[in-house]
């Protein structure tokens, strides 16, 4: 549990905010120097997501998606804008959202809202989103704040909408990264938080073809 590794919650959040302020607004910056894995990541995410957009009567709509911890819009640009009519972005770092407006190019016109906010304080508009995409950011929330955020996301879904979490998974327990002020949880801890938020797990998949030295990365589809 994060309560065992985070001593000062306020400092946990403020330190992360300070860390991201000094990161360059580039794809490499967003991926901690692993910009070269972006295509592998996005191609797998597309396949994972499209199975829900193609299903029969319960298929997920393609009107509107929300990109959480969006940064400069790496996922918005390459995954969400090609599949959804409009996209909203939320990120804690103002400079990243400012950069997104040029990085996204012409298609960026279809980004409806740029919300500058930490996810612990963010509430998606109820019944608004077909897909809420949460990638490489859950480690910046405490267990309690993550469960509460997921509950708010559940209320933000349209009929047949889904939440996707894609993130690093620890081998065991919860590991604190003091550099960027984040935690990495093991699979069972994440599944437990998902259940506590009243969500069902529709699919779970491990990302393949990533460098050996980084954490295992898993995707979860939830409703």
From Swiss-Prot:
S-adenosyl-L-methionine binds at residues 69, 74, 91-93, 119-120, 135. It catalyses: N-terminal L-alanyl-L-prolyl-L-lysyl-[protein] + 3 S-adenosyl-L-methionine = N-terminal N,N,N-trimethyl-L-alanyl-L-prolyl-L-lysyl-[protein] + 3 S-adenosyl-L-homocysteine + 3 H(+); N-terminal L-seryl-L-prolyl-L-lysyl-[protein] + 3 S-adenosyl-L-methionine = N-terminal N,N,N-trimethyl-L-seryl-L-prolyl-L-lysyl-[protein] + 3 S-adenosyl-L-homocysteine + 3 H(+); N-terminal L-prolyl-L-prolyl-L-lysyl-[protein] + 2 S-adenosyl-L-methionine = N-terminal N,N-dimethyl-L-prolyl-L-prolyl-L-lysyl-[protein] + 2 S-adenosyl-L-homocysteine + 2 H(+). CDD domains: AdoMet_MTases. It is found in: Nucleus. GO terms for cellular component: cytoplasm; nucleus. One of its GO terms (molecular function) is protein methyltransferase activity. The keyword Secreted does not apply. Distributive alpha-N-methyltransferase that methylates the N-terminus of target proteins containing the N-terminal motif [Ala/Gly/Pro/Ser]-Pro-Lys when the initiator Met is cleaved. Specifically catalyzes mono-, di- or tri-methylation of the exposed alpha-amino group of the Ala, Gly or Ser residue in the [Ala/Gly/Ser]-Pro-Lys motif and mono- or di-methylation of Pro in the Pro-Pro-Lys motif. Some of the substrates may be primed by NTMT2-mediated monomethylation. Catalyzes the trimethylation of the N-terminal Gly in CENPA (after removal of Met-1). This is N-terminal Xaa-Pro-Lys N-methyltransferase 1. The lineage of its organism: Eukaryota, Metazoa, Chordata, Craniata, Vertebrata. The gene is Ntmt1.
């Amino acid at each position: 549990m994060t309560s065992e590794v985070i001593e000062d919650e306020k400092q946990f959040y403020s330190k992360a905010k300070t860390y991201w302020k000094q990161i360059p607004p580039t794809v490499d910056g967003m991926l901690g120097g692993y910009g070269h894995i972006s295509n592998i990541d996005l191609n797998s995410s597309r396949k994972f997501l499209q199975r829900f957009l193609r299903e029969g009567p319960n298929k997920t709509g393609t009107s509107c998606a929300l990109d959480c911890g969006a940064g400069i819009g790496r996922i918005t640009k390459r995954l969400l804008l090609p599949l959804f009519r409009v996209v909203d972005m939320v990120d804690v770092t103002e400079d990243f959202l400012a950069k997104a407006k040029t990085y996204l190019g012409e298609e960026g016109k279809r980004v409806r809202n740029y919300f500058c906010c930490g996810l612990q304080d963010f509430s998606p508009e109820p019944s608004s989103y077909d897909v809420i995409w949460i990638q490489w950011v859950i480690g910046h929330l405490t267990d309690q704040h993550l469960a509460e955020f997921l509950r708010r996301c559940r209320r933000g879904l349209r009929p047949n909408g889904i939440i996707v979490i894609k993130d690093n998974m620890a081998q065991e327990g919860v590991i604190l990264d003091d550099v960027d002020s984040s935690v990495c949880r093991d699979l069972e801890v994440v599944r437990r938080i998902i259940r506590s938020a009243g969500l069902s797990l529709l699919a779970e998949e491990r990302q393949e073809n990533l460098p050996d030295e980084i954490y295992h990365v898993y995707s979860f589809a939830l409703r």
